[in-house]
């Protein structure tokens, strides 16, 4: 296919146009008075969402060059979502603001590389200030506030997430399930999560979220490497195919040929199966597999116990209520083995007491926390499927934001932290930077006010006026868009996780700086 090549200003303007389209679609959702966006789906009902990264993933333009701009800014949103789980709309608005101002300066003759350096120095300054101002999360109130804001100002959801964290611990696992009623409820179940994901993306059942979801699966635990499918696995796969239930395989590893056979079975619809590598190494791996087998009422297929894969029967497999596997983690939600789990926990406690090694004690405590903490399951209730999807996205944001707040602390929300720091950045840049580097830093300084401007605009207020009002007040004072008043953000419960604020800025400036230093674009030429 022949290529189309654009240079200099033409290249940057085409990228900017694509960015503008995406930013406008995403920024209408910003703030408590942000609106929803309807997404048409190839299959099923349209989806109504208020989530920046979900909207960004759906936008694809006819013009190849503009679409490149969309893809670049989408990257800022996706990366922020991966790191912090929230703040995707803010990242998009910031990236767009930096690009727009940077374009003007580059067109006026500024050096793009020097501007990029200035942007990077300004970002480092702001990130250090966010860390300096961040308050650690010490009580349940702050958790409720963060979760409420991220779920679209839903205080009930905030309380539920705080309750879940209270019951499974700050490192605990919170899982989302579709409920059977119209109300959302919380349930604590036996379960555990470990940091290993699916071996092959062909196992994925939910392509939107890139995860494997299995209801009531069998689970095969083995510390062996699976190599010979015909002898080792086929007898078991045939038994499971008759039950029509899914299968989760947790093994040391699976050889390419064996993996190919399992994948083919999955793709042909013969068996809903997913394979995961076992966590840990050596003896620790065996112990973790034993923990999981006790949790699910199964047995570890190991030669030490005289078992081999070709003789496995269904009653030797574990059973779970639900399994969720992503590219990085596996969550097993089990039921009804309380007595055996309790005695296993007692056994681990005794090992902790008798162990001399600090490292070993740490690992044993980790195992105990995984096994005894359980999993908090939030059953999402809604009247329609469309509402259900929207609620799940909001709850996911709220859970991620809460965990981010626990990690790095909280700062005043609603865009006010960025506005206050922009004043300090202006003074610092004037004293420390010169020429085009100063221009780069001042671009970031002005861009920092854009999220608040947009929140005010979405609430029907004048963004520039609101920004000036906030600037002249103390750091904890900001704009409450739900009632249009200037308030103490901590007292009003309008707070953001510092990690979200930091990630949004870092990813936005990274993408924007790359766009500003672009001098040429090569894309496929559309055939007439």
Swiss-Prot record:
Question: One matching Pfam family, short form?
Answer: Cpn60_TCP1
The protein's location, in the record's own words, is: Plastid, Chloroplast
Q: Which domain of life is it from?
A: Eukaryota
E.C. designation(s): 5.6.1.7
Known catalytic reactions: ATP + H2O + a folded polypeptide = ADP + phosphate + an unfolded polypeptide
Where is this chain primarily localised? plastid
SUPFAM superfamilies, sorted = GroEL apical domain-like (SSF52029), GroEL equatorial domain-like (SSF48592)
Q: Where does ATP bind?
A: 29-32, 86-90, 414, 496
A single GO molecular function term of this UniProt record: unfolded protein binding
Q: Which InterPro entries match?
A: Chaperonin_Cpn60_CS, Cpn60/GroEL, Cpn60/GroEL/TCP-1, GroEL-like_apical_dom_sf, GROEL-like_equatorial_sf, TCP-1-like_intermed_sf
Entries under PROSITE patterns matching the protein: CHAPERONINS_CPN60 (PS00296)
Q: What do the Gene Ontology cellular component annotations say? A: chloroplast
Q: Does the keyword Chloroplast apply?
A: yes
Keywords for the protein's UniProt record, in alphabetical order: ATP-binding, Chaperone, Chloroplast, Isomerase, Nucleotide-binding, Plastid
Question: Which top class of enzyme applies to this chain?
Answer: isomerase
GO annotations under biological process? protein refolding
**How does it associate, per the subunit comment?**
Forms a cylinder of 14 subunits composed of two heptameric rings stacked back-to-back. Interacts with the co-chaperonin GroES.
**HAMAP family per the UniProt record, alphabetical:** CH60
Which family does the entry's similarity section mention?
Answer: Belongs to the chaperonin (HSP60) family.
> Function of this protein?
Together with its co-chaperonin GroES, plays an essential role in assisting protein folding. The GroEL-GroES system forms a nano-cage that allows encapsulation of the non-native substrate proteins and provides a physical environment optimized to promote and accelerate protein folding.
**Can you name this protein?**
Chaperonin GroEL, chloroplastic
